[in-house]
C-alpha cells in the first residue's frame, strides 16, 4: 500500500512486518509484531489498518492490525472461530473475501468441524468490523441440509456479494438471498 509493504511469515508465532519500499533497492523493516498464528491473506481496511485472515492453532483467525505507528504495529482486534478445526478458501483464493468498510461488513466461506450443535458446518460467515467495535461474528449462512452426516462439496458456499440490502451466497447448486441487516432468508434458487 503506497510506500509500505505488509507481510507475514508462516511460523507458529506470526511476525507481521511493516516494510518501507519507497526505495526498492533498499527496503527497510520499519516495525513488526509477533503474535500467535499467521495471516495467510492481508487486505487493506484503510491507510492505517490491515485485515488479516489466517490461523491460530487449528482454527481460522481474523485480525485487525493498527499500523498507524509503523515502528510498533498492534493487533487491535481479533476473532478466532470456535470449534475443533476450521478452514477458509480465503487463504488460497482472495475472491472469496467480501469486505465493505462503509457497511462494516466482512463475509467469507468457512468450513468448521465441531461447531456448536453441528458435527460439521460449511457456509458464509458474516462479521461486522469497525475500528470502534472491532470484529464481531453476526451469523452464518449455509447451503447444506440441516445436520448433514457428511458435507456435500457442491453445496459449499464459494462466493458472496450484496446488492442494496440483500446478501447473496453462491455454491455450485444454489444461490441464497438473505437480508443484510438480520440475515433472515429472503429466497433461494436451485441451480
Regions found by a protein language model. Name each.
Residues 1-191:
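Feature marking well-ordered beta-strand scaffolds used for ligand recognition
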